[in-house]
Regions:
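Short, compositionally biased "basic patch" segments
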Residues: 1-5
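Short amphipathic
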Residues: 6-13
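Intrinsic-disorder/low-complexity, polar/charged segments enriched in Ser/Thr/Lys/Arg/Asp/Glu/Gln
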Residues: 7, 34-38, 70-72
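Generic structural detector for well-ordered beta-strands
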Residues: 11, 40, 74-76
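Amphipathic, hydrophobic secondary-structure cores in small proteins
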Residues: 18-19, 23-60
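C-terminal structural segments of small proteins and small subunits
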Residues: 51-78
């Protein structure tokens, strides 16, 4: 994980479902409330899984975008 001011980056490239979700849960437990976790993943289900995860937690799904076959997802820790 790398950190940039209020944004922490999680490299989940190459992880298959459910690992991006599990890695995200672990990363969120290690950052402060109000910080943003930026997840970089290649698993096609990561966006859907992380949106659903945020719906059932205090975390806010900020946005997602895709570049080539990589998905960039940002979550605000609640």
């Amino acid at each position: 994980m790398s950190e940039n001011h209020n944004e922490v980056e999680l490299d989940a490239i190459g992880q298959k479902c459910p690992m991006p979700l599990l890695s995200t849960k672990k990363a969120l437990s290690n950052i402060e409330k109000g910080q943003i976790l930026k997840i970089i993943a290649t698993d096609k289900n990561a966006v859907k899984d992380l949106k659903a995860f945020c719906e059932y937690t205090d975390h806010e799904f900020i946005d997602d975008r895709s570049e080539n076959e990589t998905f960039i997802i940002r979550i605000l820790k609640g």
